[in-house]
Amino acid sequence: SYFNRIINIPNYSFEGKQTASFSEASYTHIKEKTEWVAGANLWSDNFQEKQLDTFPLRNYNQITFGAFAQNSWKATKWLNLETGFRADYVIDYGIALLPRVSALFKITDKFSSRLGGGFGYKTPTIFTEESERIQYQNVMPIDKNINKLERSYGGNVDFNYRTVFGEKVTFSINQLFFYTYLNNPLLLEYQTGGLYQFINSSGHIDTRGTETNIKIGYDDFKLFLGYTFTDTRLHQNGILTNTPLTPKHRINSVLMYEVEDKWKVGLEAYYFSPQKLSDGATGKQYVLCGFMVEKLWEKFSVYINFENFLDARQTRFDTIYTGTVTNPVFRDIYAPLDGFLINGGIKLKL
């Protein structure tokens, strides 16, 4: 992949080219009750900044070698086990060992549960939401002698139930509980002389929450309802703070009408609760709504979308910068900047 990063604001410019590649080779061995997959991969990420002033260049070349093995085992009629282990060697940052496990319990024909967990990591980079907010201005390069991998440990459990009422109404519900522990999170800290430096915190971030998804079907209608609660906190030096740009409450709802090979009609609405911002303020709550219609024929279809038809955008209920137009200080973008959009088209089947 190739990404040309260019930012131009009054009295400051940022420009650079980012390229990334991924390659993998794997071998699969399948038997009656088990399946093995093993392989290796190579991942690269390179960024070269254009020298526009005397500020240190934020160039980097990240290369990761990995090897993995995973197994799926139908232990019994009611238990499926999936296990895996991955070892990555990240040049300049060392080895990351990543086990994972997942168990699916088929308790009845209508009720099942899944329990899982695993490790993860992230390589330090200047390209984060925090640094993007200030257009990477005065952000010092990542220092491989100071910075290190962010390592995460997580687990989740979910419960699934499905049934039919009166032979016409289908109902299913999924209830998920999750927890993630992020050790040594990478934080952007203000330094002397107006500079910013990414520092790995000595603390941690923990994220816990629940997610509920309901699906109801009747004839050609389907209703999807969802609710997500997320509580994310930074533990640092004995102080507990909520992390920014994480709404605690999200609600989604989608109503679909679909006649196979004839019509598709959809109405959707999404709610986002107030959330803490990086500058200490609290963002506003907002709702996004959309409507879509598609008419299908044998060889083609015609569709039209009405996106965000309530015209919810951050510039209507909050600011996106402080200061002057010629010398702005940009705030977090937590809601759409585009308002009501209409788009349509024709799909051809060849």
Map each language-model feature to its residues:
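Outer-membrane beta-barrel strand-turn architecture
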Residues: 29-33, 73-81, 97, 105-109, ...
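Face-selective signature of the C-terminal outer-membrane beta-barrel domain
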Residues: 1-93, 106, 165, 169-177, ...
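Membrane-embedded beta-barrel scaffold of Gram-negative outer-membrane proteins
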Residues: 1-8, 106, 114, 148-208, ...
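Gram-negative outer-membrane beta-barrel transporters
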Residues: 74-77, 172-182, 200-277, 347-349
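Transmembrane beta-strands of outer-membrane beta-barrel pores
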Residues: 2-6, 31-33, 42-48, 85-91, ...
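Surface-exposed extracellular loop regions of Gram-negative outer-membrane beta-barrel proteins
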Residues: 46, 58, 91-96, 110-156, ...
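C-terminal beta-signal and adjacent terminal beta-strands/loops
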Residues: 183, 295-350
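Transmembrane beta-strands of outer-membrane beta-barrel proteins
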Residues: 36-40, 81-83, 113-115, 155, ...
